[in-house]
Amino acid sequence: MAALCGGMLRGCILKPLGLSGSLQLKRNVRALRRTPVRVIQADEEGRERKQVEASRQRQPRQNESQACKAVGVSPATVDIEAPAHEFRYERALPGDKRLSKVVTIAKSKKFRDRHGQVLLEGQRLLTDALDSGAVLQTLFFSRVDYLKEFPPDKLRKTNLIKVNFENIKIWSDLVTPQGLMGIFAKPDHVKMTYPDTQTKHTLPLSLICDNIRDPGNLGTILRCAAGAGCSKVLLTKGCVDAWEPKVLRAGMGAHFRLPIITSLDWDIVPNYLPAGTKVFLADNFRPDNQNKPAEVSEKASDYGWVATDPKRIFITEDGYESSSDEEDNTDKLYIPGLEVQSYFERWAQGPCAVVIGGETHGLSIESLLLAEKSNGKRLNIPVVPGIDSLNSAMAASILLFEGKRQIENTMKRKSCVTE
């Protein structure tokens, strides 16, 4: 009986204790479900503030559609960022085809003529263009650090688009792309400003390019003209476009150091030459061939930047030459006979112009007539027998720097006389 009462007593005592334990357990579970307080460090707080400010600055640019319309492409969804150096640029998202479209159409001469835009690549070429006053409309770059190399005021109104370097590498014509490609408004020689060092050493020496159709040759010729101190370069119709990418690369910035006037008719060429300018033609005529009869050739290159007979000759309608003493001279065009002299003899004593013809089509009849009208001559560059002629770019460099030497010597003699 005592055992039975003791068991009942223990059950009554343990029951409230078990209930109390159950309540305590529930309280502990509820306490564990509470979210702990987050401790924010000072650096994390600053980082979050910057993220909030950056998110507020993400908004579409107002001139994006206008910029895309100018280059003939549709606008894409991009992010706008404001770097520390205050340049606002767009980050092109994956699938953005603006670069490929712009580069493709900018390499077309029809596009350049229609829209008046040219494509320049590389930091040096872009810098020279900006210094000369050319207007940069759109700049594609792969690294933000590249923007620091340009004057900030030159990029204020420019559409800056950051793209992956791989995209530039695909569309670049350079072996080692620099990650910079710019779309410029086609420069106008009247509105451009040239370096003071270039204008200070400018000579009364002009260059006329006649049927230069190789881009590499034309670019090299322009570079020689800038180095020799020519006052201007005139390109007649038939020459390759001076703003073709290959010409720009070979020119090494010569386009922005002296006036280059393109697509000229021969009728207006004299309007761009100073009064009293004598016109001289590059010629590979050899004195020992003077008494030899002219040979008829079907190759246009044989009538290249040179003539074969110093006497007056005619050209028939079928393109063949004939001497002036032949019986039938009907339906033939007159080609003037010009005196020939060696290039190292004195010829550059005043304002003068040198005409360089292309290696394929050579000098035009209009260039010969202009030289005759100005009392000019043909300049011969002696070469070893067996060598037909020199490259047009090589001939231009020889004649231009010889003209530079003669003009400078003449100026020195005149200065000594006046003193």
Swiss-Prot record:
SUPFAM superfamilies in the record: alpha/beta knot, L30e-like
Compositionally biased tracts (Basic and acidic residues): 44-56
Enzyme Commission no: 2.1.1.-
Domain of life: Eukaryota
Chain positions covered by the region annotation Disordered: 42-68
Catalytic activity, as annotated: a uridine in rRNA + S-adenosyl-L-methionine = a 2'-O-methyluridine in rRNA + S-adenosyl-L-homocysteine + H(+)
Binding positions (S-adenosyl-L-methionine): G357, I381, L390
GO molecular function, one term: rRNA (uridine-2'-O-)-methyltransferase activity
Transit peptide, UniProt annotation: 1-39
UniProt enzyme class: transferase
Keywords: Methyltransferase, Mitochondrion, rRNA processing, S-adenosyl-L-methionine, Transferase, Transit peptide
GO CC field: mitochondrion
Protein's cellular compartments: Mitochondrion
Name of a matching Pfam family: SpoU_methylase
Protein family per UniProt: Belongs to the class IV-like SAM-binding methyltransferase superfamily. RNA methyltransferase TrmH family.
Its job: S-adenosyl-L-methionine-dependent 2'-O-ribose methyltransferase that catalyzes the formation of 2'-O-methylguanosine at position 1370 (Gm1370) in the mitochondrial large subunit ribosomal RNA (mtLSU rRNA), a conserved modification in the peptidyl transferase domain of the mtLSU rRNA. Also required for formation of 2'-O-methyluridine at position 1369 (Um1369) mediated by MRM2.
Name of this chain's protein: rRNA methyltransferase 3, mitochondrial
Taxonomic source organism: Xenopus laevis
Protein encoded by which gene: mrm3
